[in-house]
C-alpha cells in the first residue's frame, strides 16, 4: 500500500489545509515519538531526543509548538535549534548523537506552504519502512505519557555557530577566500544567520541579500528559484561570483561575474572534473531524469559512468549508495557529495565549487568549456489533486508528436511533482524554439484534458 502522507521530501502542503494543520502535526509528533521510543538506541532509563529546526515562515512557530507537544506526549525529549538550514539539522542530529532530526520547511515553496521532514540518527532521510511505521501510528489514539514520563524541551545553545564551523571544516585548510567578492543570497530563509558568516570567516568580501526574513517573504523574488535578483546584484557590485540558496538552503545556484547562471547539472560536472584532477579518477556520478543530455555526454567523454535516478534528491542518494559513488546532483541545485555530508547542502556545495576553482585556477566558464547545454523548456501545469492525465489520448498524442519530431535530437519528460499538485512538462532540444514549441503544445493538451 502506498504512503498516505509522506511524499518524496516529507509531508508538505498549504498551512491550514490537511495535513498541515496543528492537530495533525501534533499527532505526527506523537506518532514519530512512539516509533522512536521503540527503535532508538538510548541508554537504559533514558529518553530519545530529537532536534527540531525550521525555516523562517510565520507558520513555523505554530508547527514547532505542535510537534514539540506531540513528542513530549510520547515521552521524547526535544531540542530546539530555531531557524536552521535543513542540512544543518542533519549534521547536528548526527554530531550530537540524537535519535532523530525534524525540519519544518517547505523548501523552495512560497510562504503559505510548509512541511515536515525527518532525519534518522545518522543524518539521512528516513527509510520508507520507518515512514510507514509513523503513518501506522497516526491511526492509533493518542495516549499521553504519565507526568513523570513526559518529554522535556530546551533550546540548543549556539546551533548556528556549530553548523558554521562544520561548513568551514569542509573547505581545504590550505585555501582561503581572501580577495574574492561574493554576493550571497539567502532567500530570506533558514540560512540568513549562517551562510554570510561562513564565507566571511573564510576571508571573502561578502555582500548579503535575502537576509531580512519577516515570515512572509521567503523565496519571494530571491534565492535559488528566483536568481534574477542575484544576477543583478553581482553585476551592480562588480562581484566575482554570486551564490544563491533556497529557503532551507539545500539547493545551490551560482552566478559568475558576467551574470551567467550555473545550475546543478553544470556544477556537478565541475565537481567531477575537480575530483578527476585530484584523485585521478571518478568511477561514476548520478543525475536525474531531468539532467541535461549535454552533461551526460560530457561526463561519459571524460570516462565517468553516468546513471539517471528518479527526480528527487532521496533517489539520487539511493543510486549513489547502490553504486558506491560520491557525487550526484539535480539541475535544481541539490548537490550530494557523500564524503562531505549525508545530504544535499547548498553552503557546503558552494565551498566545494570554490575549492575546485582555487585548485584549477580557472573560472566556471573555463571549467565548462566545450559543454553546451541543450535548451530545456520546463512548464509546470497546476492540476487538481488526484487529476488523471496518464490515460488521456490527447495528452498522449501531443507527447508522441513531440517525440517523433525530436527523434535522436532531444527528449520529452512528463512527471507529476512529488511535492506540489503540478505536472512538470520538460522538453529538451538542440534548438530553444523547438523545445518551447513542443513543451507549450503538451502543456496546453494537459490543461485541456484536466480542466
From Swiss-Prot:
The active site is at residue 107. Keywords: Isomerase, Magnesium, Metal-binding, Phosphoprotein. GO terms for molecular function: magnesium ion binding; phosphoglucosamine mutase activity; phosphomannomutase activity. Mg(2+) binds at residues 107, 246, 248, 250. Its cofactor is Mg(2+). The modification Phosphoserine is found at residue 107. One of its GO terms (biological process) is carbohydrate metabolic process. GO terms for cellular component: cytosol. It holds the Pfam family PGM_PMM_III. Belongs to the phosphohexose mutase family. HAMAP family: GlmM_B. This is Phosphoglucosamine mutase.
Amino acid at each position: 500500500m502506498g504512503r498516505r502522507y509522506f511524499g518524496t521530501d516529507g509531508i508538505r502542503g498549504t498551512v491550514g489545509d490537511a495535513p498541515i494543520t496543528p492537530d495533525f502535526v501534533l499527532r505526527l509528533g506523537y506518532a514519530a515519538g512512539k516509533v522512536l521510543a521503540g527503535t532508538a538506541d538510548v541508554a537504559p532509563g533514558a529518553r530519545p531526543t530529537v532536534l527540531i529546526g525550521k525555516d523562517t515562515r510565520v507558520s513555523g512557530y505554530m508547527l514547532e509548538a505542535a510537534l514539540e507537544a506531540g513528542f513530549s506526549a510520547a515521552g521524547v525529549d526535544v531540542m530546539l535549534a530555531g531557524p536552521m538550514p535543513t542540512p544543518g539539522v542533519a549534521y547536528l542530529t548526527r554530531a550530537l548523537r540524537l535519535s532523530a532530526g525534524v525540519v519544518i520547511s517547505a523548501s523552495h515553496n512560497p510562504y503559505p506552504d510548509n512541511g515536515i521532514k525527518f532525519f534518522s540518527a545518522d543524518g539521512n532521510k528516513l527509510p520508507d519502512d520507518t515512514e510507514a511505521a509513523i503513518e501506522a501510528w497516526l491511526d492509533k489514539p493518542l495516549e499521553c505519557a504519565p507526568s513523570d514520563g513526559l518529554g522535556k524541551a530546551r533550546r540548543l545553545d549556539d546551533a548556528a555557530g556549530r553548523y558554521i564551523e562544520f561548513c568551514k571544516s569542509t573547505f581545504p585548510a590550505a585555501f582561503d577566500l581572501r580577495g574574492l567578492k561574493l554576493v550571497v543570497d539567502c532567500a530570506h530563509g533558514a540560512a540568513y544567520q549562517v551562510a554570510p558568516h561562513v564565507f566571511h570567516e573564510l576571508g571573502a568580501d561578502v555582500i548579503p541579500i535575502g537576509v531580512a526574513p519577516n515570515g512572509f517573504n521567503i523565496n519571494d523574488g530571491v534565492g535559488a528559484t528566483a536568481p534574477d535578483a542575484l544576477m543583478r546584484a553581482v553585476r551592480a557590485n562588480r562581484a566575482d561570483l554570486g551564490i544563491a540558496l533556497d529557503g532551507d538552503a539545500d539547493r545551490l545556484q551560482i552566478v559568475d561575474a558576467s551574470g551567467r547562471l550555473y545550475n546543478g547539472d553544470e556544477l556537478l560536472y565541475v565537481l567531477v572534473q575537480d575530483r578527476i584532477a585530484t584523485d585521478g579518477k571518478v568511477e561514476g556520478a548520478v543525475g536525474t531524469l531531468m539532467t541535461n543530455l549535454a552533461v551526460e555526454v560530457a561526463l561519459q567523454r571524460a570516462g565517468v559512468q553516468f546513471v539517471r535516478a528518479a527526480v528527487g534528491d532521496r533517489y539520487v542518494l539511493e543510486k549513489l549508495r547502490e553504486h558506491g559513488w560520491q557525487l550526484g546532483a539535480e539541475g535544481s541545485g541539490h548537490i550530494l557529495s557523500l564524503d562531505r555530508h549525508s545530504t544535499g547542502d547548498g553552503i557546503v556545495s558552494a565551498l566545494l565549487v570554490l575549492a575546485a576553482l582555487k585548485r584549477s585556477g580557472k573560472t566556471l566558464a573555463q571549467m565548462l568549456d566545450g559543454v553546451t547545454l541543450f535548451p530545456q523548456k520546463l512548464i509546470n501545469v497546476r492540476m487538481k489533486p488526484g487529476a488523471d492525465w496518464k490515460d488521456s489520448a490527447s495528452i498522449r498524442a501531443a507527447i508522441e508528436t513531440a517525440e517523433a519530431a525530436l527523434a535522436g535530437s532531444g527528449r520529452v519528460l512528463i512527471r507529476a511533482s512529488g511535492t506540489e499538485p503540478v505536472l512538470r512538462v520538460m522538453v529538451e532540444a538542440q534548438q530553444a524554439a523547438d523545445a518551447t514549441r513542443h513543451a507549450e503544445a503538451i502543456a496546453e493538451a494537459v490543461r485541456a484534458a484536466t480542466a
